[in-house]
Design a protein with these regions (language model features):
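C-terminal cell-surface anchoring/sorting signal
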Residues: 1-22, 272-292
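Extracellular glycan-recognition surfaces and repeat-rich motifs
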Residues: 25-26, 34-79
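Short carbohydrate-recognition loop motifs
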Residues: 64-103
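Short beta-strand segments enriched in hydrophobic/aromatic residues
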Residues: 85, 128-130, 148-150, 235-237, ...
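Extracellular ligand-binding interfaces
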Residues: 114, 129-210
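Extended extracellular/luminal ectodomain segments enriched in beta-structured repeat modules
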Residues: 116-125
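Terminal, low-complexity interaction segments
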Residues: 180-265
Length: 292
């Protein structure tokens, strides 16, 4: 009877986990219980911290920047990734990286493996939130970055960098909404600008009068061998003033396979205990029905 009880509990747990596995969204939990994480670094040298073993990292944090999965701005659950930069020199990001290593202990994190060829990327989407207490310029909000190695050879690092998506470059004069969640999608028609990649800052690859209007499709054609080494959502630097907000629900589609991540705060021990009791109760009910 005891072994059967164990098997029923295990089956219940597997059932719950399987429901999450086959769902479209993977939940990444904070390192700490509510109110969650708050990683900060007052130094000018960037530092990072792993979010468990999820492949996500609080990264590039410096000059008082703060980031962490917290309960401040819950979205599709009990949490999201809180972000704050108190000055133009501050920075804070969250990144998904391929088998990342740290530059030191502590240190910043960087990718050592590729995620996929850039040419196979179909789209990326994410949700962001700007608190009305933010004093930075009105068009600023958490940006989306696709991290790349331009020639596809990860042994040469001088061509690493990223493509950046911001609303202001898509829509002209723009004021970011406040105190509400905004979901936006990047696809082949979206305008993106670059940093790094061996071609300088905001390179005008399509030779138009505007250096920020190269589409994702044009970037794919310009770098046919480029590989994706990470996805980034973050703030700064160079944002004069204070920014307070959050990001959540990043999703990318590569060759028809969509990966979505929802960030949540790890349940309190009492919540987990109640969850366990619920599983035990369900298993006990099955046993009683079987005995009857």
């Amino acid at each position: 009877m005891r072994n059967l009880f164990k098997h029923l509990v295990a089956a219940a747990v597997v059932g719950v986990l399987s429901a999450n596995v086959f769902a479209a969204t993977t939940i990444v939990y904070s390192n700490n219980p509510a109110p969650g994480d708050l990683f900060s670094n007052s130094a000018s040298t960037s530092l990072g911290q792993a979010v468990g073993t999820s492949g996500w990292y609080y990264n590039n944090v410096r000059n008082g920047g703060k980031v962490g999965i917290r309960t401040n701005y819950p979205f599709n659950g009990n949490g999201s990734v809180y972000m704050r930069t108190p000055s133009k020199d501050a920075k804070a990001d969250i990144e998904f990286l391929g088998n990342a290593l740290a530059t030191g202990n502590p240190g910043n994190f960087y990718s050592v493996t590729a995620i996929a060829p850039l040419k196979h990327l179909v789209s990326v989407s994410y949700s962001w939130y700007r608190d009305s207490t933010s004093s930075v310029a009105g068009h600023l909000h958490p940006v989306l970055r696709i991290l790349l190695d331009a020639d596809g050879d990860l042994n040469t690092v001088g061509d690493r960098g990223g493509l950046v998506w911001e609303s202001v470059y898509q829509l002209g004069p723009y004021t970011a909404p406040t105190n509400t969640w905004v979901t936006q999608t990047v696809d082949d028609n979206s305008w993106m600008w670059n940093y790094g990649l061996g071609i300088g800052f905001a390179a005008n690859i399509n030779s138009t009068p505007y250096a920020y209007d190269a589409t994702l499709a044009e970037w794919k054609a310009y770098f046919p061998n480029a590989v994706i080494i990470g996805f980034n959502m973050g703030l700064g630097s160079g944002w004069t003033g204070d920014f307070v907000g959050a990001v959540d629900n990043i999703s990318w589609t590569i060759e028809g396979i969509t990966t979505t991540t929802n960030f949540e705060v790890v349940p309190e021990p009492t919540t987990m205990a109640l969850f366990g009791l619920g599983l035990l109760g369900a298993a006990g009910g099955l046993l009683r029905r079987k005995s009857a």
